[in-house]
A protein has these predicted regions:
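Conserved structural motif at the start of ABC-family nucleotide-binding domains
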Residues: 9-11, 24-26
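ABC ATPase nucleotide-binding domain "signature motif"
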Residues: 127-137
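Conserved ABC nucleotide-binding domain
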Residues: 109-128
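The feature captures the beta-strand-to-loop junction immediately N-terminal to the Walker
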Residues: 40-42
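ABC nucleotide-binding domain signature
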Residues: 38, 79-87
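Q-loop/switch helix immediately C-terminal to the Walker
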Residues: 86, 91-106
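Helix-to-loop junction immediately C-terminal to a conserved catalytic motif
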Residues: 55
Length: 139
Protein backbone atom coordinates (compact mmCIF):
# COMPACT_ATOMS: atom_id res chain seq x y z
CA UNK A 1 0.00 0.00 0.00
CA UNK A 2 1.37 3.37 -1.02
CA UNK A 3 1.61 5.88 1.89
CA UNK A 4 0.16 8.66 -0.27
CA UNK A 5 -2.94 6.71 -1.41
CA UNK A 6 -6.23 7.28 0.39
CA UNK A 7 -8.44 4.33 1.29
CA UNK A 8 -11.81 4.11 3.04
CA UNK A 9 -12.94 1.30 5.32
CA UNK A 10 -16.65 1.15 6.14
CA UNK A 11 -18.59 -1.14 8.42
CA UNK A 12 -22.35 -0.98 8.39
CA UNK A 13 -25.34 -2.52 10.16
CA UNK A 14 -23.15 -3.85 12.97
CA UNK A 15 -25.11 -5.98 15.45
CA UNK A 16 -23.65 -7.52 18.59
CA UNK A 17 -25.30 -9.15 21.59
CA UNK A 18 -24.03 -11.08 24.57
CA UNK A 19 -26.93 -13.26 25.64
CA UNK A 20 -29.99 -11.02 26.00
CA UNK A 21 -27.88 -7.86 26.25
CA UNK A 22 -27.68 -5.90 23.02
CA UNK A 23 -24.29 -4.14 22.82
CA UNK A 24 -24.36 -2.70 19.28
CA UNK A 25 -27.30 -2.17 16.96
CA UNK A 26 -27.21 -0.74 13.44
CA UNK A 27 -23.79 0.88 13.87
CA UNK A 28 -22.10 2.51 10.86
CA UNK A 29 -18.49 3.70 10.82
CA UNK A 30 -16.28 4.97 7.98
CA UNK A 31 -12.57 5.67 8.42
CA UNK A 32 -10.04 7.00 5.94
CA UNK A 33 -6.30 6.38 5.82
CA UNK A 34 -4.10 9.26 6.87
CA UNK A 35 -6.56 10.52 9.44
CA UNK A 36 -7.47 9.97 13.05
CA UNK A 37 -10.94 8.81 14.00
CA UNK A 38 -12.24 9.01 17.56
CA UNK A 39 -15.03 6.78 18.82
CA UNK A 40 -16.66 8.43 21.82
CA UNK A 41 -19.20 7.11 24.30
CA UNK A 42 -19.90 6.19 27.90
CA UNK A 43 -18.20 3.28 29.62
CA UNK A 44 -19.70 -0.03 28.55
CA UNK A 45 -21.48 1.28 25.44
CA UNK A 46 -19.52 -0.95 23.02
CA UNK A 47 -16.62 1.19 21.75
CA UNK A 48 -13.98 -1.50 22.35
CA UNK A 49 -16.26 -4.19 20.92
CA UNK A 50 -16.71 -2.10 17.78
CA UNK A 51 -12.94 -1.75 17.37
CA UNK A 52 -12.45 -5.50 17.90
CA UNK A 53 -15.11 -6.23 15.27
CA UNK A 54 -13.45 -3.77 12.90
CA UNK A 55 -10.10 -5.51 13.33
CA UNK A 56 -11.41 -9.06 13.22
CA UNK A 57 -10.75 -10.18 16.79
CA UNK A 58 -14.47 -10.29 17.70
CA UNK A 59 -17.23 -11.69 15.51
CA UNK A 60 -20.37 -9.60 15.22
CA UNK A 61 -23.84 -11.12 14.97
CA UNK A 62 -24.08 -9.20 11.69
CA UNK A 63 -21.98 -6.66 9.85
CA UNK A 64 -21.25 -5.44 6.36
CA UNK A 65 -17.68 -4.37 5.53
CA UNK A 66 -16.40 -2.44 2.52
CA UNK A 67 -12.89 -1.36 1.62
CA UNK A 68 -12.82 1.35 -1.04
CA UNK A 69 -16.46 0.53 -1.83
CA UNK A 70 -15.82 -3.19 -2.41
CA UNK A 71 -17.80 -5.50 -0.13
CA UNK A 72 -15.81 -8.13 1.81
CA UNK A 73 -17.42 -11.13 3.48
CA UNK A 74 -14.17 -12.09 5.18
CA UNK A 75 -12.00 -10.00 7.42
CA UNK A 76 -8.82 -8.67 5.76
CA UNK A 77 -6.27 -8.55 8.60
CA UNK A 78 -3.57 -7.30 6.24
CA UNK A 79 -5.59 -4.14 5.47
CA UNK A 80 -6.70 -2.99 8.94
CA UNK A 81 -4.69 -1.68 11.89
CA UNK A 82 -5.90 -1.00 15.43
CA UNK A 83 -4.07 0.91 18.12
CA UNK A 84 -5.17 -0.27 21.54
CA UNK A 85 -5.44 2.10 24.47
CA UNK A 86 -2.37 0.71 26.27
CA UNK A 87 1.12 0.70 24.77
CA UNK A 88 2.63 -2.68 23.94
CA UNK A 89 6.32 -2.13 23.07
CA UNK A 90 8.74 -2.77 25.96
CA UNK A 91 10.60 0.41 26.91
CA UNK A 92 14.03 -1.24 26.85
CA UNK A 93 13.81 -2.04 23.12
CA UNK A 94 15.27 0.33 20.55
CA UNK A 95 13.20 1.53 17.60
CA UNK A 96 15.35 -0.55 15.24
CA UNK A 97 14.97 -3.69 17.38
CA UNK A 98 11.18 -3.29 17.54
CA UNK A 99 11.05 -3.16 13.75
CA UNK A 100 13.27 -6.22 13.42
CA UNK A 101 11.21 -8.15 15.99
CA UNK A 102 8.08 -7.43 13.94
CA UNK A 103 9.88 -8.33 10.69
CA UNK A 104 9.47 -4.86 9.21
CA UNK A 105 12.08 -3.09 7.07
CA UNK A 106 13.53 0.19 8.32
CA UNK A 107 13.09 1.89 4.92
CA UNK A 108 9.34 1.24 4.94
CA UNK A 109 8.96 3.07 8.27
CA UNK A 110 10.95 6.00 6.87
CA UNK A 111 8.70 6.14 3.79
CA UNK A 112 5.74 6.78 6.08
CA UNK A 113 7.51 8.70 8.87
CA UNK A 114 10.80 10.30 7.71
CA UNK A 115 11.44 11.94 11.10
CA UNK A 116 12.19 8.49 12.56
CA UNK A 117 15.51 8.51 10.67
CA UNK A 118 17.20 10.15 13.66
CA UNK A 119 15.58 7.76 16.18
CA UNK A 120 16.88 4.39 14.95
CA UNK A 121 18.95 3.52 18.05
CA UNK A 122 16.68 5.31 20.53
CA UNK A 123 15.08 3.27 23.32
CA UNK A 124 11.29 3.21 23.25
CA UNK A 125 11.12 4.71 26.76
CA UNK A 126 13.05 7.78 25.49
CA UNK A 127 10.53 8.53 22.72
CA UNK A 128 7.87 11.14 23.24
CA UNK A 129 4.34 9.87 23.81
CA UNK A 130 3.41 10.82 20.26
CA UNK A 131 6.45 9.09 18.76
CA UNK A 132 5.60 5.90 20.69
CA UNK A 133 2.01 5.97 19.43
CA UNK A 134 3.17 6.51 15.84
CA UNK A 135 5.55 3.55 16.11
CA UNK A 136 2.86 1.38 17.72
CA UNK A 137 0.47 2.35 14.92
CA UNK A 138 3.02 1.37 12.32
CA UNK A 139 3.81 -1.97 13.94
Amino acid sequence: MNPSEKHILEIDSVELSFGDRRILSGVYLAVETGGVTAVLGRNGCGKSCLMKILCGSLRADFRSMRIDGVWHDRFRADEVRYLAQQGFIPGWLTVDRALRDFGLPWDDLLAWFPLFGKLRGTKIRALSGGERRILESYL
